[in-house]
């Protein structure tokens, strides 16, 4: 965890003419390499990278204070894209139980219906 953004920063630095996109999760933000990367992007003035945070409010072990995380991310990189994702939209996935739940075919169909209804 936390290595995708470092690779993305390296790619953006190696080829300033290419747009690079990076996605990190809120749980991944516990890694120091994420914060070092965000700081480097800001301090170096790197313009060819776009960082997105998928914030569902959970790490693998505990809930995350998403409001605090968003403020902290914006302090490190004001242009960061912060996406709050809904974790209770699927009735069979609840909080940390979702990590260990084995989906059935019916669950997949329900999930597809939930996603289709959002379009």
Predicted segments, located by residue:
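Glycine-rich ThDP/TPP pyrophosphate-binding loop and its adjacent helix/strand module
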Residues: 2-119
């Amino acid at each position: 965890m936390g290595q995708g953004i470092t690779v993305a920063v390296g790619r953006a630095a190696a080829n300033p003419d290419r747009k690079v996109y990076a996605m990190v999760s809120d749980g991944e933000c516990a890694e120091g390499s994420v914060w070092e990367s965000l700081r480097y992007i800001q301090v170096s003035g790197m313009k060819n990278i776009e960082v997105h945070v998928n914030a569902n409010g959970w790490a693998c072990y505990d809930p995350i204070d998403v409001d605090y995380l968003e403020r902290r991310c914006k302090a490190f990189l004001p242009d960061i894209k912060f996406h709050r994702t809904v974790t209770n939209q699927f009735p069979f996935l609840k909080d940390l139980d979702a990590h260990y739940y084995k989906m059935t075919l019916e669950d997949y169909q329900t999930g597809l219906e939930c996603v289709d209804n959002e379009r």
